[in-house]
Amino acid sequence: VTAGQGIRPAGRPGTQPAGVSRWADLGGPLHYLDFGGPADGPLIVCVHGLGGSAANWVAVAPLLTGGCRVLAPDLAGHGLTQSRGRGTGVAANRALLHRFLASVAPGPVILMGNSMGGMISLLEAGEHPGAVAGLILVDPALPFLAARPDPLVAAMFLLYLAPGVGRVVMAHERRLPSARRVAGVLRLCCVEPARVAADVITRHVEVLDQRARFTGTGQDSSAAIRSVVATVGCPGRLAYQRRIHSVACPVLLIHGTGDRLVPIAAARAAARANPAWTLAEITGVGHVPQLEAPVSTARAVAGWLSAAGAGAAGAAAARRH
């Protein structure tokens, strides 16, 4: 996919500032990164996945700010946003995202969500269509209908969900050095982890180092995992499927062909079931194309914003005036 006219990358990965930290009071402190961009450009709000953070967008966001304004919040129980009594499941974080949009980014925006963040973005677009001009779904968590994850990935999630066992496993992981934990996640989520830039890895390690000082992170993670699995599997998958079909805004679905968590077959099935969507496959990358292949991801976004997503871009830019 080539970059579209009017939306241009602002630079190469690793050459741009990794966003300015800001805070909003939304029933407690919420951290987000402001990557800048033109004040009159469409606003893209990036929503990370399960166990992720706003740092998941530091490689691709600078490539979008030539034509777009880009923000990325840390959801409750993720990144630097501690739960502080707020729920960390899908429904609670969907509601928190809506509050973020209303408070920090009022008016229709383009939501760009990865994995669980794609699920939350879909649910927000279905629940509050006036708030969402368009969706960019990057390997979103999809219902377990057309395809299931890699058996080893499924076994890992079952281990986390097992009463008592999951708590012990997560406690052990939290005692590991942050760099080792980040490396493990990249091995799971990428086809070639070495493609992820060193400064991007460092940013993720820094986030985990800060999270090591927080309390209650194990319970927060367990609640989030249970909620995601309940939404894509039984009993929630049919309700989630209906919500997906109710989305009326333009949608770009970006998916790595080597994704082990959400197989490419699931994305292809979703695209067939929703023929108005635009599917952009990125060959040979995994679950986090925005980290493993940020240039290809940015090109797919740019091309869509200048073509099928032009109406969404216009609506998300008009809100700025």
Task: Go through the PLM ranges and name each one.
Residues 173-243:
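Conserved alpha/beta-hydrolase catalytic His-Asp/Glu region
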Residues 275-321:
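Catalytic active-site module of serine/aspartate enzymes centered on a nucleophile-bearing elbow/loop
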Residues 126, 135-172:
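Flexible "cap/lid" loop of the alpha/beta hydrolase fold
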Residues 28, 33-82, 291:
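Conserved HGGG/HGGXW glycine-rich cap/lid loop of the alpha/beta-hydrolase fold
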Residues 1-44, 65-68, 94-95, 99-101, ...:
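Alpha/beta-hydrolase fold catalytic core
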Residues 105-115:
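Alpha/beta-hydrolase fold nucleophile elbow
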Residues 247, 253-255, 259:
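Short beta-strand/loop motif that positions the catalytic acidic residue
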Residues 234-235, 258-262:
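Acidic catalytic loop of the alpha/beta-hydrolase fold
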